[in-house]
């Protein structure tokens, strides 16, 4: 009897231990640690908006192995990709958002540590290279890159902007070690250096080639699209984490997809939110997230973006920041974004084949007619109005601008589309040229406008003169 009771007690205790073990396993607390770059505003759909709007919670799994799981979601913000990578390699972060160059370095750093990371999605980019750019002090007489020979140009070292600068210098036929003085400088230092006249130019990534000019102390003289080198920002994950929790990776990407959809539907609203969190002006955020923006928010792995990663690896080796290559076929892993698209009832293949900018579906604020030709579109953001006004032409926008100013309305920003590259420009930073019929076309550079005007028999105007011209011919 005693022996039987003892055996029964042992069996009961064993059952309790097993039940306790099973309960602890099913009630596991799973960390989801995400590194963001909030001020790198084209990463918003991969971090800032997911965090601020609580989107991740909507998609986290609560069935199967996750039935009783608890989630510990952690967020940490960085100003660049390098320190973010350091914490990912150290096991302190599971996900990270960064550009092609730091992303490539992330993969190399993981390999060096005997681990692996995966580039799982694109967030925003340009197959031509827009987003990166070069600016000069606003008082500088420099109008083009060709005038910077022998000058000092600063750039965040080993960044995607550094890669653009090296390609731009090479296209001029210059030796980067002899014909220009390239120095390492992060944007927070470069802004002050530009204002103090300590550097002749600064090359940088999103959003600084637009932000500095919008603040009035710099002028953009080179857009990354002139280098015709694809650039993007995207999301990475620790491979071991992805293998253990693939459903969480898909959940993160589904949240990113929703953030992207929200940006497309209400760019002004979310440009304001990004401004509130980052201090980057909403008017600059709209340059990227508004329709026909500087970059395209595109989560699909287009061949050009795969190429950008390969180019980044080669350049990092040239800069002696990497001593090995990466197998792009394994480092870039699109299985998770494909699964996220499918779970969101979206067609990944259709998105992969689409190269269009964020579309503009609007009527001309002056005529009320639908805008169908986007090559001369201009926009006005009036303070106090929740939506940006769109116009089919710069002439129409500038005429409306004059009327708004007469009414005492405060203007937040005026935008125009570059006629050659198609990128969105701050109109007060652009150059304009007329054709034989007097229609205004916008350009980033004075030289581009002069070339167009010469070919068309027209004239060149800066923003002030272009607005006066539009009012005069009304």
Regions from the PLM with identified roles:
Residues 28-175, 181-184, 200, 229:
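Short, glycine-/small- and polar/acidic-enriched structural segments
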Residues 69, 152, 156-167, 172, ...:
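Ligand-binding clefts/hinges and TM-proximal coupling segments of bilobed small-molecule sensing domains
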Residues 111, 183, 188-277, 395, ...:
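Pocket-lining segment of extracytoplasmic ligand-binding domains
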Residues 316-361:
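Conserved C-terminal helix/tail region of periplasmic/extracytoplasmic solute-binding proteins
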Residues 50, 131-141, 231-247, 433-434:
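A bilobed periplasmic-binding-protein/Venus flytrap-type ligand-binding module shared by bacterial periplasmic
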Residues 364-367:
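Short cysteine-rich clusters marking metal-coordination/redox-active sites
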Residues 40-41, 244-323:
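Secondary-structure end/capping motifs
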């Amino acid at each position: 009897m005693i022996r039987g009771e003892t055996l029964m007690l042992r069996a009961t205790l064993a059952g309790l231990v097993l039940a306790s073990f099973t309960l602890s396993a099913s009630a596991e607390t799973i960390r989801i640690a995400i590194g963001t770059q909030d001020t790198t505003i084209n990463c918003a759909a991969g971090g800032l908006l997911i965090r601020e709007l609580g989107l991740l919670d909507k998609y986290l799994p609560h069935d199967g192995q996750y039935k009783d799981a608890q989630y510990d979601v952690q967020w940490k913000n960085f100003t660049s990709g390098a320190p973010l990578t350091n914490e990912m390699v150290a096991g302190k972060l599971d996900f990270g958002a960064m550009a092609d160059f730091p992303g490539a370095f992330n993969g190399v750093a993981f390999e060096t540590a005997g681990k692996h990371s995966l580039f799982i999605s694109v967030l925003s980019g340009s197959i031509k290279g827009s987003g990166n750019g070069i600016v000069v002090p606003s008082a500088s007489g420099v109008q083009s890159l060709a005038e910077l020979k022998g000058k000092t140009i600063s750039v965040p070292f080993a960044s995607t902007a550094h890669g653009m600068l090296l390609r731009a210098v090479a296209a001029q036929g210059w030796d980067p070690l002899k014909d220009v003085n390239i120095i390492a400088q992060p944007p927070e230092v470069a802004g002050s250096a530009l204002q103090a006249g300590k550097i002749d130019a600064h090359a940088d990534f999103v959003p600084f080639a637009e932000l500095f000019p919008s603040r009035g102390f710099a002028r953009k003289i080179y857009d990354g699209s002139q280098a015709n080198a694809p650039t993007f920002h995207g999301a990475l994950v620790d491979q071991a984490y992805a293998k253990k929790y693939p459903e969480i990776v898909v959940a993160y990407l589904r949240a990113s997809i929703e953030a992207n959809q929200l940006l497309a539907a209400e760019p002004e609203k979310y440009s304001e939110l990004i401004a509130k969190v980052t201090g980057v002006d909403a008017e600059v955020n709209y340059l990227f997230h508004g329709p026909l923006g500087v970059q395209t928010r595109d989560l699909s792995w287009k061949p050009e973006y795969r190429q950008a990663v390969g180019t980044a690896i080669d350049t990092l080796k040239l800069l002696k920041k990497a001593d090995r290559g990466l197998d792009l076929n394994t480092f870039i892993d699109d299985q998770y974004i494909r699964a996220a698209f499918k779970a969101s009832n979206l067609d990944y293949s259709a998105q992969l084949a689409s190269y269009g900018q964020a579309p503009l579906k609007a009527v001309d604020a002056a005529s009320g007619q639908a805008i169908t030709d986007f090559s001369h579109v201009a926009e006005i953001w009036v303070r106090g109005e929740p939506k940006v006004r769109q116009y089919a032409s710069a002439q129409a926008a500038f005429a409306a601008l004059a009327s708004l100013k007469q009414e005492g309305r405060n203007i937040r920003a005026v935008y125009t589309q570059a006629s050659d590259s198609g990128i969105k420009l701050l109109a007060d930073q652009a150059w304009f040229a007329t054709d034989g019929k007097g229609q205004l076309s916008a350009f980033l550079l004075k030289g581009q406008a002069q070339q167009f005007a010469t070919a068309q028999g027209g004239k060149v105007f800066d923003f002030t003169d272009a607005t006066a011209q539009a009012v005069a011919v009304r």
